[in-house]
C-alpha cells in the first residue's frame, strides 16, 4: 500500500460509503460533565430510519461527511465525534423524534457562540435525509460556560446602579417607530420618563436614517434623560440603539453614549450577529454601560414547531454572548408565547441552576455557575389591564415594556406613563398584601382607578382590547 493511503496504525484505508450508525450511534454512551448536549426534533424523509437520521445529525454537525476519507486515519475520531446516544419518538406526532447528541468540548472554540452555532446548527439543517430539523435545547457544561463573560452586569448590579428594588422595571418603546425628528423624539422620551417610567426605548429598526441621524437622537435623548431625572429624583434611561452596519461603527455609537453619561445602550443581537454582540458586551462591562438586547428576526428562526431553533436556545446563547435585558414575549400580549414554555426560558435567563423539566420544555439540567442573570423583557401589545397578569407571571426581576400602551393614552405620553406606573404599584402592593393577582387582578386595577384619573382613562380606552389566537409553538 502506498504511503498516501496508509493510516497512522498502518491499516489500509477502505474507501466508500458506510452507514452513519456504524460510527455515530452509541446508545450505551454515558455523557460526560464536559459534553455539550443537544436535543434535536427530527422529521426524517419517508423511508429514512430514525436511527440513521439521528446519526446523520451527529455526524454532519461534528466530524462526519458523506463518504469515508483517508484523513480519518490521521486523528482520533472517537475523541472528537458527536454521538447520538438516544432517540425518542415525539408523543402525538407522526414521524417526529427527539435525537440526543453529545459533543466533546474540544470541538468548540472557547468563548465563541459563533463557533458553537456554526458547528451545531450549520450545514446539517439542509441535510436531504431530513424533512425538518429543530434544535430544541442545549446543555452548556460549566467548563464551557466559564469561558464566557456573559452579561455585562446582570440583574443585581443593574438594580444597584438604578437604586430600584422590589418591583418590575417599566419601559416604553417610542412610537411611531420611524419618521420622527430627533428633537420630537427627545420630547416623547422626556414625557414618558417624567410620567413615571424607568426606561424608554429605540425601536429595533431605529439606527441612523435620513430623518433622524444617530448622533442627533443621542443628544436630544440625553437631554430628556437629565431633565426628567432632575424633576423626578429617579435614575432614568433610554435604550440607545447602537446597532450599525459595522462593528467599528457600533462601538463608536456606544462610546458616544458613554461620553454623554447615559446608563444603557441597545443591540439587535440576531441581525447584528453574535460576534458583534459579544464585542459590545465586553465594551459595556469595561465602560459601565448596561446592555439591552432586542431579538428582531427571532421568529424567522424559532416560530415553526418542527424546524429551526427554539427560542430557549437563543436565550441561552444570549446569556453567554452578553446582554442585561432581552425581549422574551408576554404570554398575554400580541406576540407568540405559551405560558409554560415562556416561564421555562425566563428561568433559564434569570436563575443560576435550572432543573430538567419537560413540562416547560427544558430538556437538560442547566448550571450557569454564577454567570450573571438577564432581565426578561415582556413587550408587545400590552396595556394596563395586563398589569396583574404580567406581574404575576414575570415577578419582580423583569422589565414590562409598553409602547402603544403608554403613547396611546388619550391625554398624551406623560399621563400614559402615570397610568402604567400607578397600575404597577397597585399590583405590587396587592401582591405584597397577599392578594391573588390572577383572580383579583381586574378588581385591583378598578380600585386604583378611583384615585388615578390617568389610569381610569387608560382602562376605559383599552377595556375591549384582547389578542386571543391559538399558540403555534406548543410543547
UniProtKB/Swiss-Prot annotation:
The active site is at 175 (proton acceptor), 294 (proton acceptor). PROSITE patterns: RUBISCO_LARGE. InterPro entries: RuBisCO (IPR033966), RuBisCo_large_chain_AS (IPR020878), RuBisCO_lsu_C (IPR000685), RuBisCO_lsu_C_sf (IPR036376), RuBisCO_lsu_fd_N (IPR017443), RuBisCO_lsu_N_sf (IPR036422), RuBisCO_lsuI (IPR020888). One of its GO terms (molecular function) is ribulose-bisphosphate carboxylase activity. It catalyses: 2 (2R)-3-phosphoglycerate + 2 H(+) = D-ribulose 1,5-bisphosphate + CO2 + H2O; D-ribulose 1,5-bisphosphate + O2 = 2-phosphoglycolate + (2R)-3-phosphoglycerate + 2 H(+). It comes from the Eukaryota. Its main location: plastid. Mg(2+) binds at residues 201, 203-204. Substrate binds at residues 123, 173, 177, 295, 327, 379. It is found in: Plastid, Chloroplast. The disulfide bond which can form in the large chain dimeric partners within the hexadecamer appears to be associated with oxidative stress and protein turnover. GO terms for cellular component: chloroplast. CDD domains: RuBisCO_large_I (cd08212). Keywords: Acetylation, Calvin cycle, Carbon dioxide fixation, Chloroplast, Disulfide bond, Lyase, Magnesium, Metal-binding, Methylation, Monooxygenase, Oxidoreductase, Photorespiration, Photosynthesis, Plastid. Residues 1-2 form a propeptide. The record marks 334 as: Transition state stabilizer. The modification N6-carboxylysine is found at residue 201. Belongs to the RuBisCO large chain family. Type I subfamily. The basic functional RuBisCO is composed of a large chain homodimer in a 'head-to-tail' conformation. In form I RuBisCO this homodimer is arranged in a barrel-like tetramer with the small subunits forming a tetrameric 'cap' on each end of the 'barrel'. HAMAP family: RuBisCO_L_type1 (MF_01338). RuBisCO catalyzes two reactions: the carboxylation of D-ribulose 1,5-bisphosphate, the primary event in carbon dioxide fixation, as well as the oxidative fragmentation of the pentose substrate in the photorespiration process. Both reactions occur simultaneously and in competition at the same active site. Heterohexadecamer of 8 large chains and 8 small chains; disulfide-linked. The disulfide link is formed within the large subunit homodimers. This is Ribulose bisphosphate carboxylase large chain. It comes from Marchantia polymorpha. The gene is rbcL.
Amino acid at each position: 500500500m502506498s504511503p498516501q493511503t496508509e493510516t497512522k496504525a498502518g491499516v489500509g484505508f477502505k474507501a466508500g460509503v458506510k452507514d452513519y450508525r456504524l460510527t455515530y450511534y452509541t446508545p450505551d454512551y454515558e455523557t460526560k460533565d464536559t459534553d455539550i448536549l443537544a436535543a434535536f426534533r427530527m422529521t426524517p424523509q419517508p423511508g429514512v430510519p430514525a436511527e440513521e437520521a439521528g446519526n446523520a445529525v451527529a455526524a454532519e454537525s461534528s466530524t462526519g461527511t458523506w463518504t469515508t476519507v483517508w484523513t480519518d486515519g490521521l486523528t482520533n475520531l472517537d475523541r472528537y465525534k458527536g454521538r447520538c446516544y438516544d432517540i425518542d419518538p415525539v408523543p402525538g406526532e407522526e414521524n417526529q423524534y427527539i435525537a440526543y447528541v453529545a459533543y466533546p468540548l474540544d470541538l468548540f472554540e472557547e468563548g465563541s457562540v459563533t463557533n458553537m452555532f456554526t458547528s451545531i446548527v450549520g450545514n446539517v439543517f439542509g441535510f436531504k435525509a431530513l424533512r425538518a430539523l429543530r434544535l430544541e435545547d442545549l446543555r452548556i457544561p460549566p467548563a464551557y460556560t466559564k469561558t464566557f463573560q456573559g452579561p455585562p452586569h446582570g440583574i443585581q448590579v443593574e438594580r444597584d446602579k438604578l437604586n430600584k428594588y422590589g418591583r418590575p422595571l417599566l419601559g416604553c418603546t417610542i412610537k411611531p417607530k420611524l419618521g420622527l425628528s430627533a428633537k420630537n423624539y427627545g420630547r416623547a422620551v422626556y414625557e414618558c420618563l417624567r410620567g413615571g417610567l424607568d426606561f424608554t426605548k429605540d425601536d429595533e429598526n431605529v439606527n441612523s436614517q435620513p430623518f433622524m441621524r444617530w448622533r442627533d437622537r443621542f443628544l436630544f435623548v440625553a437631554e430628556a434623560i437629565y431633565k426628567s431625572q432632575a424633576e423626578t429624583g429617579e435614575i432614568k434611561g433610554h435604550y440607545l440603539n447602537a446597532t450599525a452596519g459595522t462593528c467599528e461603527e457600533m462601538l463608536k455609537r456606544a462610546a458616544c453614549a458613554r461620553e454623554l453619561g447615559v446608563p444603557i445602550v441597545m443591540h439587535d443581537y440576531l441581525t447584528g450577529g453574535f460576534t458583534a454582540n459579544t464585542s459590545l458586551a465586553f465594551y459595556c462591562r469595561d465602560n459601565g454601560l448596561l446592555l439591552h438586547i432586542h431579538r428582531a428576526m427571532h421568529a424567522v428562526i424559532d416560530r415553526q414547531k418542527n424546524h429551526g431553533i427554539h427560542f430557549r436556545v437563543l436565550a441561552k446563547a444570549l446569556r453567554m454572548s452578553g446582554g442585561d435585558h432581552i425581549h422574551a414575549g408576554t404570554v398575554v400580549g400580541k406576540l407568540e408565547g405559551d405560558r409554560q414554555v415562556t416561564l421555562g426560558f425566563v428561568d433559564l435567563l434569570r436563575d443560576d441552576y435550572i432543573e430538567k423539566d419537560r413540562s416547560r420544555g427544558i430538556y437538560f439540567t442547566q448550571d450557569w455557575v454564577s454567570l450573571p442573570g438577564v432581565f426578561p423583557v415582556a413587550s408587545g401589545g400590552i396595556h394596563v389591564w395586563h398589569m396583574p397578569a404580567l406581574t404575576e407571571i414575570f415577578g419582580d426581576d423583569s422589565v414590562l415594556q409598553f409602547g402603544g400602551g403608554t403613547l396611546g393614552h388619550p391625554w398624551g405620553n406623560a399621563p400614559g406613563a402615570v397610568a402604567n406606573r400607578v397600575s404597577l404599584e397597585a399590583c405590587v402592593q396587592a401582591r405584597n398584601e397577599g392578594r391573588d393577582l390572577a383572580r383579583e387582578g381586574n378588581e385591583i386595577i378598578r380600585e386604583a382607578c378611583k384615585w388615578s384619573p390617568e389610569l381610569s382613562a387608560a382602562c376605559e380606552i383599552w377595556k375591549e382590547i384582547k389578542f386571543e389566537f391559538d399558540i403555534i409553538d406548543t410543547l
